[in-house]
Amino acid sequence: MVADSDGFRQLGADRLVSYAARRMTVLPIEFLRDSFPKLFARGMEVLENRAAAGDARAQRILDDVKGVTGAASLQIDDEPPVILSAQQGSLSAGDAPADQVPIRIMAALPGDALQLLLGEVAKAGALEDEEVAVGAAQTASKRFEDALAGRPMTCHITIADVPSLGNIDVRVGFNVSTLPAEPGFTTELRFPDLESVQRGELTVQDLFLGGKLKMEGDYSLALQIAMQLLTNPL
C-alpha cells in the first residue's frame, strides 16, 4: 500500500484528517488505529458511489485499491508499531498484520511533529472534504506494488521549514524486514513547495524535474517508478 501522486497531494499536512463520526483524534497512535481506517473506508464509499454513477476514473481507482494485499508497519517514536493491513479494498489496524497479509512497507515517524500537524488539521475542519477521504484510500495502490515488483527500497525523507516544527524526518522502507540505519537514498522537500503542490501551483513532475526535491544516494529505482506512474496516470 502506498499513496500515488494524487494521494500524496490530497493527504498533505493541511489535509490529513479522520472521518470518525465527525471527530478526529490528534494522538498519532489513536489516529492510525481508529481514525485513518475510517477515513479510508469513507474514501472507498465515495469512490463506489462515483463509479456507480458512471465515473470511469473512480472505477479505475477502485480496481487499483482493491488489488492490494499488503500491510504497512508504522512506528511512532519508540512505541510498538501500528500495522495497517489492506486487502480487497478494506483497511484494518492492529498489532500484527491480518492473516496472510505480508508487510510491504515500514516507516518510523516522529510523534511530537505528527501530533502537532494533526492538531492543525483538526482546527482546519477538513472533515467534509470527500477528496481527502479518496486520497486516504489511494494510499493502497496495486500499480505501485507492481512497479516496485518486490524490490527493496529504503529512504530517509526530510520535510524542511515546517512552521513551528522546523524539519521533520521520516524513515521509510519497502519490501524490507527492518529499517536500515543508512538508507538507499535521502530526499528533502521544503514545506512551502509541498503547499504549492496542494494548491495546484506545482505538480509532482515539477518537484522531480525542477530541482525541488534534493535527492542523494541511489534513487534510480524511485525515479523510475515515479516517472512510470506519473506518465501513465489512472
Language-model regions, residue ranges each:
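Feature captures hydrophobic
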Residues: 2-234
